[in-house]
Amino acid sequence: AAEMYFGSLENRKILVIGATGKIGQIMMKNIAADHHVQLYAASRQLKSGEKAVLGTDTLSDGHGTRHQQTEEYVQIAYADRYRLANEMDVIISATASPHYTLTKEGWQSGVIQKRRRILIDMAVPMDIEAGIEDEENSLCHLDELTSLSEKNQHLRFEAADRAREMLERDT
């Protein structure tokens, strides 16, 4: 969703709220592995300003050479999430919290910099309160992502069918 919104995530600043949880960790690893971004993690367990290592993976380049890839991110305290939101291009919230991690009131008082950004809510129940979205801020919920995924899967199946038909015609 964020790539569709911006076209590319290269050099974007991305904040993951709930980064120490299961979904948050998966999101962090996937983002770090696929994109050259500045990654930030907010959680109630994290302290601000510390750099941390997401993990080290051994990668093969297909020619027998193996490389170590270490992904770093900056930890921020949960209480600093609105202040840091001013600098972010993408904010992903993936917590098991029963309350909102981003509220309309907190957003209006803490996020003063107007800029184009996308907020992605991966939680059930929702983490991000409706009403934050406006001309600059787009809000995408888990149900929208599911629908988008299903559409993309359908398009891939159609493309595979067309390719299969072309191969059958040519053989």
Located regions from the model:
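Glycine-rich adenosine-cofactor-binding loop
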Residues: 2-32
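Cofactor-binding loop segments of dinucleotide-utilizing enzymes, especially the Rossmann-like FAD-
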Residues: 19, 44, 122
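NAD(P)-binding Rossmann-fold cofactor-contacting core
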Residues: 25, 34-59, 64
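Short acidic low-complexity segments
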Residues: 67, 71-88
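Rossmann-like NAD(P)-binding element
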Residues: 81-104, 112, 116-120, 124-125
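Adenosine-phosphate binding glycine-rich loop
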Residues: 108-118, 122-171
